[in-house]
Amino acid sequence: LYRKGLQKDGTAPCLLYGYGSYGISIPASFSVSRLSLVDRGFVYAIAHIRGGQERGYRWYTQGRLLNKMNTFTDFIAAGEHLAEAGYTSRGEITAHGGSAGGMLMGAVANLAPSLFKGLIAEVAFVDVLNTILDETLPLTPPEWLEWGNPIEDKDAYEMIASYSPYDNVRRQAYPHIFALAGLTDPRVTYWEPAKWIAKLREFST
């Protein structure tokens, strides 16, 4: 979504939204809240990445369990395409996601920090490995269907460890990050984004 007459010269800022989990589709739809951004020259885009079901059930299965890395590389590819097509440029993209989409934000921050100017991570599920290993948490066992059971499956453990945002923070330059935590959120405990941001403050250069 962008204003008529947009010059595709890479100068426009972009807000790129993504989710990519649980087979949830994010259809293109009208929202008056986006018009304020578009009126100020933004390009607004939604990335239909694997893990969602925008292109059928197989699209979902290719973005869960041992295929989860596809979710993150798809989102990065969407951002790179927008830049290559001139809608925006590298370093002018702000990414937005919440809950499992917040995990997406944390993962792409580690994998491709220079692509993004900023990230908006709402109630972000970023301490994935620690949470999925704790079977005493009431919501953990049902989540094994989506992420795998790292307690019993070595491959699932290694896959989750490879992308869990908190565990993969390293010393590098990160984009600006706005993180929101929900004090009473029943799914994502508030300390996950809190400890993630604390670690980012320590390691970001």
Spans of model-derived segments:
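Short beta-strand-to-loop junctions in surface cap/lid or active-site-entrance loops
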Residues: 1-10, 165-170
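Active-site-proximal cap/loop segments of hydrolase catalytic domains
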Residues: 46-205
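Short amphipathic alpha-helix adjacent to the substrate-entry channel of hydrolases
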Residues: 28-48
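Short hydrophobic segments within beta-strands
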Residues: 2, 17-18, 96, 180
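Structural cue for short, hydrophobic secondary-structure segments
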Residues: 17-20, 36, 46, 179
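Short beta-strand element of the alpha/beta-hydrolase
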Residues: 9-21
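Short beta-strand segments enriched for Tyr within beta-sheet-rich domains
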Residues: 12, 42, 116-117
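Glycine/threonine-rich flexible loop motifs
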Residues: 23-29, 54
